[in-house]
A protein has these predicted regions:
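Amphipathic alpha-helical dimerization/coiled-coil segments
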Residues: 84-104
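N-terminal helix-turn-helix DNA-binding core of bacterial DNA-binding proteins
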Residues: 2-45
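A cross-family signal for key residues in well-ordered alpha-helices
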Residues: 16, 29, 51, 84, ...
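Basic amphipathic alpha-helical segments that dock to polyanions
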Residues: 46-47, 53
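Beta-hairpin "wing" of winged helix-turn-helix
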Residues: 54-69, 74
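Intrinsically disordered, low-complexity serine/threonine- and proline-rich regulatory segments
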Residues: 1-6, 86, 90
Length: 104
């Protein structure tokens, strides 16, 4: 992730939900819950995003049992680094905002 690059809110919540392995529907539910309903992912949108995140090496699809139709995904170490940088960036934004508001 290049310095100064911000994740979209959807990508942020998808990555955050994949700290623990989840299948697509679980990702949609967790994302909606964590965002207090602000981020609602349609299946097509989610699977397009998952494909792109796999290509970047930020997440990986886990092996599935032969009879399972559910695909599970999990954050990679690279994805964890991206997520940590984004959390740090968001903290800095909030701290700067609070500082300016306090100073009036």
């Amino acid at each position: 992730m290049a310095e100064g690059f911000a994740l979209t809110e959807s990508t942020y919540y998808i990555l955050l939900s994949l700290v623990r392995a989840r299948h697509g529907y679980g990702i949609m539910q967790q994302t909606e819950e964590m965002s207090n309903g602000r981020v609602r992912l349609a299946a097509g949108t989610l699977y397009g995003a998952l494909s792109g995140l796999c290509e970047k090496g930020w997440i990986v699809q886990l092996p599935v049992e032969a009879d399972s139709r559910r695909k599970e995904y999990k954050l990679t170490e690279k994805g964890m680094q991206v997520l940590r940088r984004e959390v740090d960036r968001l903290k800095e934004l909030a701290e700067n905002g609070e500082k300016i508001l306090r100073e009036g």
